[in-house]
């Protein structure tokens, strides 16, 4: 084990958080743990993390979202496995679906918030390919609106307004998830 990984592991062990307790970061791969790093120690964590990454160590920590942050969206699409006849799993949504979704978000955001036109930017990220998971086909996109900074209550409100338009924007063939499961609320807080 490298020195960088040992140093990071010792630091992480010092701030390990029990399930259900306050946390600042979680690891989404082995070991799956949560940590609660004090603000005054956070730069040390980032430096140790950077050293480990540049040393070739694969790490998968996420940060707990802050109450005031850019609008974030996680759309989780699930499809019946039998809806994919061919050997290769193909994507069921297309660019037109993504444009419709992002456009609907912008319409809702701009209707309820006073947003400068230059702030109407969205970044859309997607997995390279859909995957099979628990006998379903799993796919989805993440969207971030980097210049539209709001609190979590506003993000929940926007999510509610999106769910009201779900029939229009999630008209994707063979989708088998309900809108409340598609628009993941866990990304908000």
Predicted regions and their residues:
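Generic secondary-structure transition motif, activating predominantly at the C-termini of alpha-helices
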Residues: 12-19, 166, 170, 187
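Eukaryotic intrinsically disordered and solvent-exposed regulatory patches
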Residues: 44-48, 55-60, 122-131, 178-187
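Helical (often loop-to-helix) elements that flank the catalytic cores of nucleotide-handling enzymes
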Residues: 81-110, 137-183
């Amino acid at each position: 084990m490298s020195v960088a990984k040992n140093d990071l592991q010792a630091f992480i062990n010092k701030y390990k958080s029990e399930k259900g307790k306050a946390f600042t970061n979680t690891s989404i791969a082995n070991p799956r743990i949560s940590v609660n790093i004090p603000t005054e120690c956070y730069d040390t964590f980032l430096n140790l993390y950077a050293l480990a990454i540049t040393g070739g160590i694969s790490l998968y920590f996420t940060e707990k979202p802050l109450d005031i942050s850019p609008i974030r969206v996680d759309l989780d699409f699930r499809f019946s496995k039998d809806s994919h006849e061919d050997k290769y799993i193909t994507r069921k949504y297309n660019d037109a679906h993504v444009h419709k979704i992002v456009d609907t978000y912008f319409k809702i955001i701009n209707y309820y918030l006073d947003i400068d036109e230059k702030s109407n930017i969205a970044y859309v990220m997607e997995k390279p390919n859909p995957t099979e998971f628990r006998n379903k086909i799993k796919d989805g996109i993440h969207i971030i609106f980097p210049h539209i900074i709001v609190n979590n209550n506003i993000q929940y409100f926007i999510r509610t307004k999106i769910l009201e338009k779900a029939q229009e924007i999630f008209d994707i063939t063979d989708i088998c998830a309900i809108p409340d499961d598609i628009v993941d609320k866990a990304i908000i807080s």
